[in-house]
Amino acid sequence: MAKIVVALGGNALGKSPQEQLELVKNTAKSLVGLITKGHEIVISHGNGPQVGSINLGLNYAAEHNQGPAFPFAECGAMSQAYIGYQLQESLQNELHSIGMDKQVVTLVTQVEVDENDPAFNNPSKPIGLFYNKEEAEQIQKEKGFIFVEDAGRGYRRVVPSPQPISIIELESIKTLIKNDTLVIAAGGGGIPVIREQHDGFKGIDAVIDKDKTSALLGANIQCDQLIILTAIDYVYINFNTENQQPLKTTNVDELKRYIDENQFAKGSMLPKIEAAISFIENNPKGSVLITSLNELDAALEGKVGTVIKK
């Protein structure tokens, strides 16, 4: 039996609640399949498209005097509940369909960051919708948002993405796992909070990379494997070129060389690779599997996906 953290990519969860629900239903079957094989799993997820849409919608309402504007921390909490609810319901239904009595809980999770993290001066986390170049330039002019080209898929707004330091609800997560509860935690990388005087916390405008928080969570609970599910089936070098090559098996040293060669795009694949390296360096006996949401079953059989070891 293995203990596994499964990190679902926000981009892989679709562009609407309806599309996301259908994708989540299929994912639930694969995740429950892991449980029936005796594995203990903890689920995390991204929220880039979702938190961007929530923030955009609420700010649009505020601009038209239809309600207050909401900070990113609160938008992150909303996205945790929205995505977590659909995952939780789909997993409960799938477990019920096979006669398995297991509680599923979505835990609103805060993650401490450093308010002096240089990321606050260098926004890099893509969120929200994809735009063409002209649309992005127009929005940037009107609202002052920063946009970058995102892995050949269009232009997206970017926000600060500080490094996760600690998971505030870690002991609660451990207690739930110990009591045989299927936990959905650290959604969207966690709600970013900074430590104040007397050990209080306060939310801050940012979106933490979910893979980096998932790696931290995996190391903290000493899991055997981190599975990062994204929109592509392998990690590639020379991505989106005629010479692109899938990496089927690789190791930390090789990945560090590829990082030096700028093989991985900032804001998309690079944080996943950095998370994988961090997880393995903190947990040398562990491994990382990176593949697409649709190929999870095949990846678990070793037919597809990138496997990373020390």
Curated annotation (Swiss-Prot):
Pathway annotation: Metabolic intermediate metabolism; carbamoyl phosphate degradation; CO(2) and NH(3) from carbamoyl phosphate: step 1/1
Intracellular or extracellular location(s): Cytoplasm
InterPro entries the record matches: AceGlu_kinase-like_sf, Asp/Glu/Uridylate_kinase, Carb_kinase
Entry annotated with the keyword Nucleotide-binding: yes
Signal peptide start-end: none
GO molecular function: ATP binding; carbamate kinase activity
Origin: domain of life: Bacteria
EC code: 2.7.2.2
Disulfide bonds: none
Keywords tagged on the record: Arginine metabolism, ATP-binding, Cytoplasm, Kinase, Nucleotide-binding, Transferase
Pfam family, one: AA_kinase
GO CC, any one term: cytosol
Top-level enzyme category: transferase
Catalytic reactions on record: hydrogencarbonate + NH4(+) + ATP = carbamoyl phosphate + ADP + H2O + H(+)
GO terms of biological process kind: arginine deiminase pathway
Keyword Transit peptide on entry: no
Family stated for the protein in its record: Belongs to the carbamate kinase family.
PANTHER family: CARBAMATE KINASE, CARBAMATE KINASE-RELATED
Name by which UniProt lists this protein: Carbamate kinase 1
Protein source organism: Staphylococcus aureus (strain NCTC 8325 / PS 47)
Gene transcribed to yield this protein: arcC1
